[in-house]
């Protein structure tokens, strides 16, 4: 916990934790209690199961079940990564992301496979708080300014249509 205290002390706004949250729910409870609004839990999924230790091991627990268990710790968000799609530039697993986001009560940040502005547009209609775009930014497939514009337009149109 001292490392987290030090990192937040130098100005980091949010900290993402992964495997340790799965291995030690008490630690996560303590962490979220001491640093409310600062802790994000990363859940990496392989065929719906939680992958840990840098994706070298897959747990028997489903990502949704794990997310429901950690909700009581009250993390600020969950980064949900479908590792089968991450970095592949083949598009995200929309059904997996939507299913996950609709079954948990913590804000979800989608990650893994976002390849095009069309992917951004589709995900911006899902019940997700945000998305992480990685390789597609580096390759130039997506311009950040265009992705932001799409998300702002989708949010604005939902608000005008009364769907949020």
PLM regions with names:
Residues 27-34, 124-164:
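C-terminal helical cap(s) of enzyme catalytic domains, especially alpha/beta-barrels
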Residues 87-89, 117-120, 139-142:
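Short active-site-adjacent structural elements
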Residues 1-11, 27, 95-133, 147:
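Catalytic cores of alpha/beta
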Residues 56-77, 91-105, 109, 114:
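Short loop-to-alpha-helix "cap/lid" segments that border enzyme active sites
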Residues 2-86:
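Conserved anion-binding
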Residues 45, 84, 92, 114-118:
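Short beta->alpha linker loops
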Residues 22, 113-114, 138:
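Short, surface-exposed acidic/glycine-rich loop or hinge patches that mediate macromolecular interfaces
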């Amino acid at each position: 916990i001292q490392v987290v205290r030090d990192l937040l002390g130098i100005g980091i706004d949010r900290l993402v934790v992964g495997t340790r949250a799965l291995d030690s729910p008490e630690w996560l409870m303590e962490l979220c209690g001491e640093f409310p609004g600062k802790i994000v839990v990363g859940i990496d999924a392989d065929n719906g199961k939680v992958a840990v230790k840098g994706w070298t091991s897959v747990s028997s627990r489903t990502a949704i079940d794990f997310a429901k268990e950690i909700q009581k710790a009250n993390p600020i968000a969950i980064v949900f990564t479908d590792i089968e799609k991450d970095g592949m530039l083949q598009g995200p697993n929309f059904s997996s992301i939507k299913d996950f986001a609709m079954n948990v009560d913590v804000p979800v940040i989608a990650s893994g496979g976002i390849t095009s502005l069309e992917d951004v547009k589709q995900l911006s209609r899902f019940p997700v708080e945000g998305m992480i775009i990685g390789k597609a930014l580096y390759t130039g497939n997506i311009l950040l300014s265009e992705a932001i514009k799409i998300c702002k337009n989708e949010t604005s149109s939902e608000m005008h249509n009364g769907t949020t």
